[in-house]
Amino acid sequence: MRRRFEVCALMGVFALVMSCTGAIATPRDGAPVVGEWNGLHASLTLTESGGSIEYDCAHGGLRAPVEPDNAGQFTVAGVHFRDHGGPVRIGEVPDSMPAQYVGKVQGDQLTLRVIVGAETLGPFTLKRGAGSRLLKCL
């Protein structure tokens, strides 16, 4: 009888730990990820309608919300702008290119790659609420 109680109690604790771990490890399927995500060489701001990103010598925008699947993975179309040193000239048209923002969310960590044509930027490891460390073009 005592053995049966111990096994049941252990199974209950295991189920509780597994359910909490899953809730922390990845967001709910389809729920938009929002907030400030920062790290070395990148700063990402996500909203319920899309987002913006700033890199050392570039910036960009996400045209849709980040809605990870059950595994925490996502792909969002957007735009990428190459920056340059010095001021922006009057009438200057930014150098924009289509981009795919591909990543994975695990708890308070987001890993991001940005695909621009044949070039892949990253991976960037970003943490929710952390400070960013950007080295802007001069």
Identify the role of each PLM range:
Residues 27-43, 133-135:
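Tryptophan-anchored aromatic micro-motifs
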Residues 76-102:
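An anionic, turn-rich surface loop/hairpin at beta-sheet edges
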Residues 8-19:
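Bacterial N-terminal signal peptides
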Residues 40-82:
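N-terminal glycine/threonine-rich, aromatic-flanked beta-hairpin/loop signature
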Residues 44, 63-67, 92, 97-105, ...:
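Hydrophobic/aromatic beta-strand elements that line small-molecule binding cavities or substrate pockets
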Residues 20-25, 60-73, 109-138:
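Edge beta-strand at a domain terminus
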Residues 1-3:
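N-terminal secretory signal peptides that target proteins for export/translocation
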Residues 31, 38, 47, 60, ...:
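Residues that act as N-cap/strand-start positions at coil-to-secondary-structure junctions
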